[in-house]
Amino acid sequence: MENKIKVVFCGTPKIGADVLKALIEMNEVEVVLVISQPDKPIGRKKQIVYTPVKKLALENNLKVVQPNKIGEIYDDLAKLEFDFLITCAFGQFIPTKILKLAKTDSINFHGSLLPKLRGGAPIQYAIKNGDKKTGITIMQMVKQMDAGDYYVQESIDILDSDDSGSLFEKMGQLAYSMCKKYLVDIYNHKFELIKQNENEVTFCKNISSEEEKIDWNNTSLDIFNLIRSLSPSPISYTTINSQRYKIKSSKIINLDNQNKNVAPGTIIDINRQGIVVKTLDSSLLILEIQKEGKKMILASNYYLNKLSDLKISDKFD
């Protein structure tokens, strides 16, 4: 290709960096600017950590800007010549006047099979909902969030062993391969755009801190899926006597008949595998648990090391 495809890329977390990596590796593409969310302090020491997209961009000598709102740099973008504005997990609303600056199109790599799961947390919600499949949609960006026509979709399976960390990894690999496979054809207008079916639209707002709390009156499957969807971060939690415990992983097990009348949330066993808690319909084996102010540990430590802050018959709120 004589003239390279000029791209302005917007992204922030690791999945965004996966798409940027594909763009950097493509001989047909020149990344003229990278836009990422401002760096944030991380951890107890509040150290400023570069976003994964910024880190990759700097390693490849690309220009990076980090506006609080992308509208602040409209004038600078208007002076640039670029074919595509490409986003993946950027985390900011992009005004229509910026979308219109791209000569070919402004496109987004969205982490669901649209029209399902429009919104900011599609990967987490796919697990939380118990979906067996999800995927990446390469779509046109329009004013309404995730409502544009799309060029192409590819799907992957969600395994029972997946949590949001492993699914983000798989989705990043899928987005990477789709970028390499389809971008040049999109540039050369080889795709017919597909309209989303408005009758099948579902939404996924960002998960609130209240929704991170486990409700033991739900089924084991619902709780199991919630825990997976919030692992490895921010991690679901439960409380007992105002003490918070984070629960990172679990397993569904069936109850003996003798426990059918036990209230949901009650600890019914502590054994070599972990801590068994009654749910609405069966029971859940907690595998990894973290008491507030302590480190995450295997729940089996409560049996092996005779830890005393949780006991059989204690009841989580």
Swiss-Prot record:
InterPro entries xref list: Fmt, Formyl_trans_C, Formyl_transf_N, Formyl_transf_N_sf, Formyl_transferase-like_C_sf, GART_AS, Met-tRNA-FMT_C, Met-tRNA-FMT_N
Keywords of this entry: Protein biosynthesis, Transferase
EC numbers for this chain: 2.1.2.9
Binding site for (6S)-5,6,7,8-tetrahydrofolate: S112, L113, L114, P115
Reaction(s) catalysed by this chain's protein: L-methionyl-tRNA(fMet) + (6R)-10-formyltetrahydrofolate = N-formyl-L-methionyl-tRNA(fMet) + (6S)-5,6,7,8-tetrahydrofolate + H(+)
Keyword Protein biosynthesis listed: yes
One Pfam family of this chain: Formyl_trans_N
GO cellular component, as recorded: cytosol
Highest rank taxon of the organism: Bacteria
CDD domains: FMT_core_Met-tRNA-FMT_N (cd08646), Met_tRNA_FMT_C (cd08704)
GO molecular function per UniProt: methionyl-tRNA formyltransferase activity
NCBIfam families named among the record's database cross-references: fmt (TIGR00460)
Assigned protein family: Belongs to the Fmt family.
Protein role: Attaches a formyl group to the free amino group of methionyl-tRNA(fMet). The formyl group appears to play a dual role in the initiator identity of N-formylmethionyl-tRNA by promoting its recognition by IF2 and preventing the misappropriation of this tRNA by the elongation apparatus.
Protein name: Methionyl-tRNA formyltransferase
Annotated organism of origin: Mycoplasma capricolum subsp. capricolum (strain California kid / ATCC 27343 / NCTC 10154)
Lineage of the species this protein comes from: Bacteria, Bacillati, Mycoplasmatota, Mollicutes, Mycoplasmataceae
